[in-house]
Design a protein with these regions (language model features):
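Arg/Lys-rich amphipathic alpha helix in sigma70-family domain 2
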Residues: 51-53, 64-84, 102, 153
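Sigma70-family region 2
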Residues: 2-3, 42-57, 76-77
Length: 164
């Protein structure tokens, strides 16, 4: 990779690193796992960057790589760890980027998102980023109509989790 390409990558990564943190919060439930996943996603982005063609926004491409990496690692770890009740093992998450008044709500939201399946997690995060259905469909590789249907189901599922 050329120095100019490296600088461009570093700049884009810096501007969009919150995307990686959001994906990590949805697929991990503790700080060490969050850091490990963040590092793995960054490595995968670095490896894949020379193949980035610019046909979509960098952030859209970044989401796709981040989700694929998270899902892949999540599935691998699922095979290695005995399944337990997720809610029993969740600890309060700390979010240093937000003021104290929003911590509890944000923690509850991320716990709810954490309990969703892989596609639903991705949909919820992209929705929270105000992505259009077109952008969501491109990021996840599904049709726009399918994105709308899945999004409505995911919203309903989240409402039921948050307001039992």
């Amino acid at each position: 990779m050329t120095q100019e390409l490296e600088k461009t990558f570093a700049s884009e990564l810096e501007k969009n690193q919150s995307i990686i943190h959001k994906v990590c919060r949805s697929y991990t439930n503790n700080e060490p796992a969050h850091k490990d996943l963040f590092q793995e996603i960054t490595i995968q982005l670095w490896k894949a960057y020379p193949k980035f063609r610019g046909e979509s926004k960098f952030s859209t491409w970044m989401y796709r790589v981040a989700f694929n990496t998270a899902i892949s690692l999540y599935r691998k770890s699922k095979r290695n760890v005995e399944t337990t009740q997720i809610y029993d093992n969740l600890k309060e998450l700390e979010y240093h980027d937000y003021d104290d008044s929003k911590d509890r709500q944000l923690s509850l939201l991320y716990k709810a998102i954490y309990s969703l399946n892989d596609i639903e997690k991705a949909l919820a995060l992209l929705y929270l980023e105000d992505k259009s259905y077109k952008e969501i469909s491109e990021t996840l590789g599904i049709s726009e109509v399918n994105a709308r249907v899945k999004m409505n189901r995911t919203k309903t599922k989240l409402k039921n989790i948050l307001n039992p």
